[in-house]
């Protein structure tokens, strides 16, 4: 092993010489102080170029401890700098402003980050605004198309419903199926009287097991058919429609 490395290892074992060197930085110059005398360390860092690289590679911890050596091993300029400027000249009062200053910038960026977050959200909203507008326009267009289709369907349904009552009324007329006996009696009555009085209509309805409305509708249809065939207009002896006179004289049974 190299003598310098072995001396460094031996110097780490007894801590007293190291502390003596630290507390007596000018021991190299005068050699006398008020502290008890300690034997000088057998090594010096003025021989740094002669220190082999193998020792530093083999013992990195010891080489680092040796590099952080006593002040007397440093050059003269570093001695002067350390004497004029202590190593730790900071006072406890100086730490508080620094901590406050550190806290303030930390709090500042936090608030700024919040503001930036809100502003970024605002920017996102503003940038997303046109997209939302386009989406709203598209939804309104779809709604208008749906409404127009609904209106068309409703109009077609209304037309169908309008056509349905006519068809239903025709179906009702067709569903009114008279028997042969009923038709014979109605034809005989129509041959004698084209218009029926209310009383006579009631009697025929009771005799034929029909309603007065069915009898009235049958006579109306029969008169229309007779008018189309003959082309003439029948006139009652009194010059008015007996059914109309009966309807004005008495309330309708419908």
Curated annotation (Swiss-Prot):
Q: Which GO terms describe its biological process?
A: hematopoietic stem cell differentiation; sclerotome development; somite development; somite specification
Specify whether Transcription is a keyword of the entry.
Answer: yes
Extract the PROSITE patterns matched here.
HOMEOBOX_1, HOMEOBOX_2
Pfam families given for it? Homeodomain (PF00046)
Q: Which CDD domains match?
A: homeodomain
Q: Which GO terms describe its molecular function?
A: chromatin binding; DNA-binding transcription activator activity, RNA polymerase II-specific; DNA-binding transcription factor activity; HMG box domain binding; RNA polymerase II cis-regulatory region sequence-specific DNA binding; sequence-specific DNA binding
Which portions of the sequence form the region Disordered? Answer: 87-178, 227-254
Q: Can you say where in the cell this protein is located?
A: Nucleus; Cytoplasm
Residue ranges of the annotated DNA-binding region, renumbered to this chain:
171-230
Recorded hits in SUPFAM superfamilies, A to Z, give: Homeodomain-like (SSF46689)
The main location class comes to: nucleus
Per UniProt, the keywords (alphabetical) are: Activator, Cytoplasm, Developmental protein, DNA-binding, Homeobox, Nucleus, Repressor, Transcription, Transcription regulation
What InterPro entries is this protein classified in? Answer: HD, HD_metazoa, Homeobox_CS, Homeodomain-like_sf, MOX-1/MOX-2
List all Basic and acidic residues biased stretches: 154-178
Keyword Ribosomal protein in the entry? The reply is no
Q: Name one GO cellular component term.
A: nucleus
Report the function annotation for this chain. Answer: Mesodermal transcription factor that plays a key role in somitogenesis and is specifically required for sclerotome development. Required for maintenance of the sclerotome polarity and formation of the cranio-cervical joints. Binds specifically to the promoter of target genes and regulates their expression. Activates expression of NKX3-2 in the sclerotome. Activates expression of CDKN1A and CDKN2A in endothelial cells, acting as a regulator of vascular cell proliferation. While it activates CDKN1A in a DNA-dependent manner, it activates CDKN2A in a DNA-independent manner.
Name used for this protein in its record: Homeobox protein MOX-1
Write down the species: Pan paniscus
What gene codes for this chain?
Answer: MEOX1
């Amino acid at each position: 092993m190299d003598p310098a490395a072995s001396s460094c290892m031996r110097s780490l074992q007894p801590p007293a010489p190291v502390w003596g060197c630290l507390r007596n930085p000018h021991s190299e110059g005068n050699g006398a102080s008020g502290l008890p005398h300690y034997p000088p360390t057998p090594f010096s860092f003025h021989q740094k170029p002669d220190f082999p690289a193998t020792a530093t590679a083999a013992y990195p911890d010891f080489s680092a401890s040796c590099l952080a050596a006593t002040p007397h091993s440093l050059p003269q300029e570093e001695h002067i700098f350390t004497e004029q400027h202590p190593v730790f000249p900071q006072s406890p009062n100086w730490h508080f402003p620094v901590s406050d200053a550190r806290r303030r910038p930390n709090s500042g960026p936090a608030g700024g980050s919040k503001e930036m977050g809100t502003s970024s959200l605002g920017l996102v909203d503003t940038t997303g605004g046109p997209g939302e507008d386009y989406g709203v326009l598209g939804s309104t267009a779809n709604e208008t198309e749906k409404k127009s289709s609904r209106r068309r369907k409703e109009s077609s349904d209304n037309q169908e419903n309008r056509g349905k009552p006519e068809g239903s009324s025709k179906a009702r007329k067709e569903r009114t199926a008279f028997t042969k006996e009923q038709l014979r009696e109605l034809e005989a009555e129509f041959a004698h009287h084209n218009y029926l009085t209310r009383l006579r209509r009631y009697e025929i309805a009771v005799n034929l097991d029909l309603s007065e409305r069915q009898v009235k509708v049958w006579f109306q249809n029969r008169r229309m058919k007779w008018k189309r065939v003959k082309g003439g207009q029948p006139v009652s002896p009194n010059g008015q429609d007996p059914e109309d006179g009966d309807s004005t004289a008495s309330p309708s049974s419908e």
